[in-house]
């Protein structure tokens, strides 16, 4: 059976661990415990093919920047996460996560995932963001960023509501089993 290594990255507290625990156990964790490194494994059947999906949960906090990249070798697909309710985590995809992943693994496919989709219409979240002069990230903003970083797909999910979680990892498997050429936006012109 083919094994696929999927590394999940993104800012601290965007919901990476909840996404992985929800996918592997169908349960939502009750408390937030910052991750240093964790591994999960699941058999996944996608388009009639069964694979062993090795899921790597990484620390988003800056103090783990040097340690985190040790998990990158032999990665088959990256899932870069941001919270729909956190515009700074969205901006960090462009400024931190995409550059880091591309530096270490330039030819590995990327999925961009907006987490905590359930908070987009939640009154307390909307009020908090409005007080900061911000708003939740829209699906259109997610699609635009995915295009900008040449992600294979943009998906949204809510681990709390078990909405879109299975689709994230099905698409991660598809990105490996059915690769599309990765366009990085760089071209070489010889004169």
From Swiss-Prot:
Residue positions binding GTP: 10-17, 28-35, 57-61, 115-118
Residue positions of covalent lipid attachment, annotated as S-geranylgeranyl cysteine: 188
Main location group: membrane
SUPFAM superfamilies: P-loop containing nucleoside triphosphate hydrolases
Protein modification: (Microbial infection) Glucosylated at Thr-35 by C.difficile toxin TcdB.
GO molecular function: GTP binding; GTPase activity; protein kinase binding
The entry's keywords: ADP-ribosylation, Cell membrane, Disease variant, Glycoprotein, GTP-binding, Lipoprotein, Membrane, Methylation, Nucleotide-binding, Phosphoprotein, Prenylation
Topology relative to the membrane: Lipid-anchor
Glycan-carrying positions: 35
Modified residues (Phosphothreonine): 138, 180
Record PTM Cysteine methyl ester, positions in chain: 188
GO cellular component: cell projection; cytoplasmic vesicle; cytoskeleton; cytosol; endoplasmic reticulum membrane; extracellular exosome; focal adhesion; glutamatergic synapse
Positions carrying ADP-ribosylasparagine: 39
Propeptide stretch(es), residue numbers: 189-191
Record Gene3D superfamilies: P-loop containing nucleotide triphosphate hydrolases
Localization annotation: Cell membrane
PROSITE patterns assigned to the protein according to its UniProt record, in alphabetical order: RHO (PS51420)
Motif Effector region mapped to chain: 32-40
Function: Plays a role in immunological synaptic F-actin density and architecture organization. Regulates actin reorganization in lymphocytes, possibly through the modulation of Rac1 activity. Required for the formation of membrane ruffles during macropinocytosis. Plays a role in cell migration and is required for the formation of cup-like structures during trans-endothelial migration of leukocytes. Binds phospholipids in an activation-dependent manner; thereby acting as an anchor for other proteins to the plasma membrane (PM).
Descriptive protein name: Rho-related GTP-binding protein RhoG
């Amino acid at each position: 059976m083919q094994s696929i290594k999927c590394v999940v990255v993104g800012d601290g507290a965007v919901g990476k661990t909840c996404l992985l625990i929800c996918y592997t156990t169908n349960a939502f964790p009750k408390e937030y415990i910052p991750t240093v490194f964790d591994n999960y494994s699941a058999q996944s059947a996608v388009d009639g093919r069964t694979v062993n999906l090795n899921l790597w949960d990484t620390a988003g906090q800056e103090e783990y920047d040097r340690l985190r990249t040790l998990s990158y070798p032999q990665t088959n697909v990256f899932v870069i996460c941001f919270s729909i309710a956190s515009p700074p985590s969205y901006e960090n995809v462009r400024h931190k996560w995409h550059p880091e992943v591309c530096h270490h693994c330039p030819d590995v496919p990327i999925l961009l995932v907006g987490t905590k989709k359930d908070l987009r219409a939640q009154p307390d979240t909307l009020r908090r963001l409005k007080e900061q002069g911000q708003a939740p990230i829209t699906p259109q903003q997610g699609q635009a960023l995915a295009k900008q970083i040449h992600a294979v797909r943009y998906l949204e999910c809510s681990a709390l509501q078990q909405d879109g979680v299975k689709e994230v990892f099905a698409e991660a498997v598809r990105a490996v089993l059915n690769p599309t050429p990765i366009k990085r936006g760089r071209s070489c012109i010889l004169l």
